[in-house]
Amino acid sequence: MRSISVLFLLIMILSCPLSAKSTAEEQNLYNECNKGNGKYSSCTKLIEILSKKCDSGNMEKCDDLGYVMGLELGMREAAFVPLEKSCKAGIAASCFNLGIHDIAIRGNVKRAAHNYSIACEKYSERLEEERIFKLKSCALKTALENCLRDQEEHDPVKCAKKAFWEISDKYDSNSTKE
């Protein structure tokens, strides 16, 4: 259970809370929801707004919705739907976060490897803020494929969690100079 909690803490640290294109209302609701302040109604209002935008095809809002549902409100299973939708549309951050969810919640290493493959392809190496995620995604894709290949010798989920932490530690300590 501790590893799941730690993985979600990592998601919170690694992910942008809301996309750069958030409205002032969305940002205010997010801040009220995030800070607790007894404003659960702010969280539900934010989910309502993001859900409508996600349903109308705004994939960045699907990414935001998955983040808020999964991290802020602990609705981890419900977070899969908007994250899957935005990952399929090529939103790299959703694919990265979905990979974490796949390992930690569902134990689906094959699916996590697939999602990291998409994130590896979609993150830009030219944008400094995305480069570290590209490096991590590409390394995780390879590591998880190895975990799946060697599953007769060890538990692929344990292997995937170990690989995730090793790769995260490596890139977090070495910055983006790899």
Label the predicted regions.
Residues L7-S15:
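Bacterial N-terminal signal peptides
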Residues K110-E125, F164:
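TPR/TPR-like (Sel1-like) alpha-helical repeat modules
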Residues E129-E178:
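Terminal, low-structured helical/coil segments at or just beyond the last alpha-helical repeat
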